[in-house]
Amino acid sequence: ETDIPYCIPAGDMGAQEDWCPENSSEGFKGMITLKSALANSINTVSARLMHRVGPQPVINLIDKLGVDTENIPAVPSIALGTPDLSLFEMVSAYSAFANKGVHVEPQIVSTIVDKNGTVLYQSVPKAKDIISQESAYVTVNLMEGVTQYGSGARLRSGAINNYVYNNVVTGHPYMFKNPIAGKTGTTQNQSDGWFMGMVPNLVSGVWVGGDDRSVHFPSITYGQGATMALPIWAVFMKKCYEDEALNISQEDFERPEDLSIRVDCSQPVEGERQEVELPDELDF
């Protein structure tokens, strides 16, 4: 993809006026891989991709992933996370990617047992194949870039000398070594900060914000998901790993056999066709 100024004209895909998203950082990077663009929250690339796919197929897919789509408009700006979603919905949707394309409906209560040990209620998970194992793996691989060299790199040793993170109460650096896929998120005016994180057998998320969106950080330095929400996720995961009884995975995400999609696009392959035709529907 290409990180250059990009506009979707009024009337196209439900846009009421020309929509020209900007990046949080100044300037543009030119040619960039989709993985790197996602890792660094390059909005122009997300807009370009949405323009190619269209918002309605995206809405159809997330509906199958447990998201209430009734009030989500079919407009291109949803590519930047404009809909109001609950943390419950986000964890539900992300779990399908970690679970090899299978969505399992989350349960608040799994079992009810009386004082004698008799099981009064046992939930039966509702599982459904939503996307292919290959598509799920590629999505996870894309999001691994976020914690490897993107906005979530401080989970490892990234930003180790950044003054913003020095002496914070949550501890830094976090120095995770295991594979982690994730995504930071920041809403308009720094009113909300998100971090969603995945390891092979656990999906968890953190939202920081308030009911009154007029209460927010004055700048993105402290008001972004990487500084508001990610540290809480890091502390939570460290506690999870300290409890060996939880058996939280530190292994790689399982790669499907005969993977047909090349996940390392940093170097073009000689003779490979650069433009591909998009399917009529997303993979569901």
What are these regions (language model features)?
Residues 10, 81-82, 106:
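Structured DNA-binding interfaces in DNA transaction proteins
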Residues 4, 76-78, 107-110:
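Extracytoplasmic/periplasmic beta-strand context in beta-sandwich domains
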Residues 51, 63, 98:
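Short polybasic/polar patches that bind polyanions
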Residues 10, 71, 214-218:
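Extracytoplasmic/secreted cell-surface and envelope-processing proteins
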Residues 1-58, 103, 114-145:
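Conserved catalytic neighborhood of penicillin-recognizing serine enzymes
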Residues 14-23, 54-92:
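Mid-domain, small-residue-enriched loop/turn segments at the edges of structured enzyme/sensor domains
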Residues 36-40, 86-274, 282:
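A penicillin-recognizing enzyme superfamily signal
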